A protein has these predicted regions:
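Membrane-embedded beta-barrel scaffold of Gram-negative outer-membrane proteins
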Residues: 308-340, 488-491, 496, 514-580, ...
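Gram-negative outer-membrane beta-barrel transporters
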Residues: 375-379, 428, 438, 539, ...
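Outer-membrane beta-barrel domain signature, strongest for Gram-negative TonB-dependent receptors
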Residues: 232-378, 386, 536
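Surface-exposed extracellular loop regions of Gram-negative outer-membrane beta-barrel proteins
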Residues: 261-272, 386-396, 450-453, 479-522, ...
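Outer-membrane beta-barrel translocator/receptor signature
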Residues: 113-114, 124-128, 137-146, 151-237, ...
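Extracytoplasmic beta-strand/coil segments of soluble accessory domains associated
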Residues: 29, 45, 77, 81-122, ...
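Conserved C-terminal beta-signal and adjacent last beta-strands/turns
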Residues: 2, 368-370, 374-381, 422, ...
Length: 743
């Protein structure tokens, strides 16, 4: 065992010695206006059934609706800042979208993501749909599962899952209205109403959100003076209907819709490799302006609409057997225009006015059986999905400035899977084995992908298809040392789908790439106890991942049919590696009314073997999407005032992320996004004078830190690098009114 492995394993042993615990993101705190003394149980659905977070042998960060509001989590970066081992990378286009990366497992260019997102147990068919602004209203909870999830969910994931669960209709009338006013002319409103149409038989819930906010990046001209980028303009709603016609039968149908119409992301030139005097002058002018003022030659915009209808129908035959079916249909269209080089020079841009730039239709179906046979709880099921993606992209390219060409690509991805997983409680065999449980699961997956691409700039039409079949497994064993302390060990195996590159010839040896595989070993402890009279909760996980057929994108030159070459992106699977780390989440109530939550992640990753055919990868190439250190501290103090005046809480959090590589190869001299730290503050007054009214003042990025959240690197092909930056200091006022029976 290496020194680092001893260090990681030792973290779990140290926690065992402490025999106390906490869980940072997932804590809900029960309190009165004058005291906060206990940490409340948190219910999660990580194993497709409701369980106490502390009894699940998986590293999980969970958020209640109040925590999402208190920490002002409104986009992917906000969520990542509050979750260890999760980061969000934004490319700049489409402006509101971004990818989640858990434990270094994320998306590669034109390939499947290693981290999957779900809404109401249905997969997100497109990278970045869930988590964008407008996703966080009227949720029941939000969970981030870390580590391979290969045997219980519809899609196979090597990094983890992000689960969005909406509020379902209940059998009581009620709801809420919430409004927000802030700087940059921010205006936001959320609301929901719950209507029991027929008592405990027909239940309806309607929720909606809308926001308008000016952008914080301004165009100085000469083409579009005064146009603001990074603005927000979206609206959405959900309609949920729950039917319970007979005992044991439930049918939940949800329709949701969201549309957005913005001016796009305000990307900023970061580096220039061109020797063109005009481009050098444009870059120098941008450097003098700073990152909040830009000059584009392409009229940017970002328009999208998204709709989904899903149904969950279950029938409980008895306490030991339930059958459940989940079906969904999703449609999404995007139209966007984007200035790749972010300058007033005609270098490279992309635009589509007459047709969607991207779009898809997606269908998923899952049949599930849940049951219990004495001491064995099991879940078995079948899953299938179909994703059809017609994509049209008009753009000006560096090798043909001033000429608009159309890239037309159609893809079809299908998968079918069968899975089974069971948990056995050995305490049923003998009292001596009480507290000992084991979980085993297996999933067999068959995937098929096909694509047709027309790329006029290289004068060719290419098509191809590929099929894959593989199995994934899970084995966990956990033991309760005490009723409040559990230790566990797990071994999990998962795959990420392979595919092919339509931009290169079959004879190149780069047209096909196999599935990516990760085998993960994990040790953990979860404990909720008292330490010197203080309520504590600690969750620690140490993991060791063996990574095979690592998918990385690289730049290659192909014949353009005009006597020259053109650079294109391809995905290659040419390396092995390891990803090891420790995750800590803890909560502490040192005095009545004061809650301190801490989370931290340390990650160490490296390539262990690289194929001689690898492009731009060596053993020394840094892993992308993996900051070595990442953490946050949140402190909330509820003032000891009489409850008839309400509850007043002052809270603040500090978050930190070390530098992170966003380059998948060493083909660029600009691989790193710098480290950053943030401070956020909030003052809440809930139940004002005993009324169902609340108010809050908030400020995010209090120190006005300028930090990058994404990068597009065309230095090798076109001589420029651009970056996307997070919002500056934001502040505002929130008001909330709840109606219906008191809770």
């Amino acid at each position: 065992m290496t020194f680092k492995h001893r260090y990681l394993a030792g973290a779990c042993l140290a926690a065992l010695a402490l025999s106390c615990g906490g869980e940072a993101g997932a804590q809900a705190v029960s309190s009165t206006a004058s005291a906060q003394t206990t940490l409340q149980e948190v219910v999660v659905t990580a194993r497709r059934r409701s369980e106490d977070l502390q009894s699940v042998p998986i590293s999980i960060t969970a958020f209640t609706p109040k925590q999402l509001t208190d920490r002002h989590i409104t986009n992917q970066v906000d969520l990542a800042n509050n979750t260890p081992s999760l980061i969000a990378i934004q490319s700049g286009y489409p402006g509101e979208y971004g990818g989640f990366i858990v434990r270094g497992q994320g998306p590669a260019y034109n390939a499947t993501s290693g981290t999957e997102t779900y809404f109401a147990e249905t997969p997100d068919p497109y990278l970045g749909l869930e988590g964008r602004p407008g996703s966080y209203y009227d949720l029941a909870n939000l969970e981030v599962l870390k580590g391979p999830q290969g045997t219980l969910f519809g899609k196979n994931s090597t990094g983890g899952n992000v689960l969005f669960e909406p509020q379902r209709p209940t059998n009581s009338y009620g709801g809420y209205l919430e409004g927000q006013l802030g700087n940059y002319n921010d205006r936001q409103a959320d609301g929901a109403v719950n209507l029991p149409i027929v008592d405990d038989k027909v239940l309806l819930r309607v929720a909606g959100t809308v926001e308008r906010r000016d952008g914080y990046t301004t165009d100085v001209g000469p083409y579009f003076p005064g146009r603001d980028y990074d603005n927000l303009s979206y609206e959405g709603f959900r309609i949920g209907l729950l039917l319970k016609p007979v005992e044991g039968l439930e049918s939940y149908t949800l329709y949701r819709y969201q549309q957005s119409d913005t001016n796009g992301a305000g990307t900023v030139p970061y580096a220039n490799e061109s020797t063109s005097p005009a481009r050098i002058a444009a870059f120098d002018a941008q450097a003098a302006r700073g990152v909040r003022d830009v000059s584009y030659d392409t009229l940017e915009f970002n328009k999208s609409f998204y709709s989904q209808v899903l149904n969950q129908t279950s029938y409980r035959f008895n306490d030991a057997l339930t059958v459940k079916n989940i079906v969904s249909f999703t449609r999404d269209y995007l139209a966007y225009s984007y200035d790749y080089d972010a300058s007033p020079i005609n270098v490279a841009g992309q635009s589509s006015y007459a047709m969607p730039t991207q779009g898809f239709d997606y269908i998923s179906e899952e049949l599930q059986l849940q049951g219990k046979i004495q001491s064995l709880q099991y879940t078995a099921g079948l899953f299938g999905d179909n994703l059809y993606t017609p994509e049209y992209e008009g753009f000006n390219y560096i090798t043909a400035p001033g000429h608009t060409v159309l890239l037309d690509q159609m893809t079809n991805d299908r998968s079918h899977a069968g899975f089974v997983q069971g948990t056995y409680d050995f305490g049923g065999l003998s009292p001596v084995l009480s507290g000992l449980s084991a979980t085993a699961g297996y999933r067999e997956t068959a995937e098929y992908t096909s694509s047709l691409s027309a790329v006029p700039i290289v004068h060719k039409v290419t098509a191809g298809s590929a099929a894959f079949q593989y199995g994934s497994y899970t084995f966990d064993i956990d033991y309760k040392l005490t009723p409040n302390t559990m230790i566990y060990a797990s071994l999990r195996d998962a795959y990420k789908a392979g595919g092919f590159n339509t931009t290169v010839a079959a004879s190149s040896g780069l047209s096909f790439y196999p599935p990516e595989k990760l085998v993960n070993k994990e040790l953990g402890i979860k404990s909720t106890n008292e330490l010197w009279g203080m309520q504590t909760r600690v969750d620690i996980a140490a993991y060791f991942g063996d990574y095979d057929n690592i998918q990385r994108q690289a730049l290659v030159n192909v014949d353009n049919g005009m006597g020259g070459t053109v650079p294109v992106q391809v995905v290659q699977s040419v390396a092995k590696g390891r990803v090891d780390g420790v995750e800590f989440e803890g909560s502490l109530i040192p005095i009545s009314g004061l809650v301190i939550t801490v989370n931290y992640a340390y990650t160490d990753a490296a390539y262990t073997q690289v194929s001689p055919n690898a492009i731009g990868i060596t053993l020394a190439t840094p892993f992308p999407g993996l900051p070595q250190n990442k953490g946050s501290i949140n402190t909330a103090y509820t003032f000891p005032i009489n409850s008839e005046y309400g509850r007043v809480t002052l809270s603040g959090d500090v978050t930190y992320q070390s530098k992170v590589s966003v380059a998948t190869t060493n083909q660029t001299p600009y691989p790193w996004l710098p480290a950053y730290g943030l401070l956020n503050l909030r003052l809440d007054w809930d139940h004002i004078f005993g009324r169902p009214i609340g108010a809050a003042l908030f400020a995010t990025n209090v120190t006005n830190k300028t930090y990058a959240t994404g990068q597009l690197d065309f230095s090798a092909s076109s001589g420029f690098v651009t970056r996307t930056y997070a919002p500056p200091r934001m502040f505002g006022l929130q008001l909330r009114y709840a109606f219906g029976p008191p809770h």
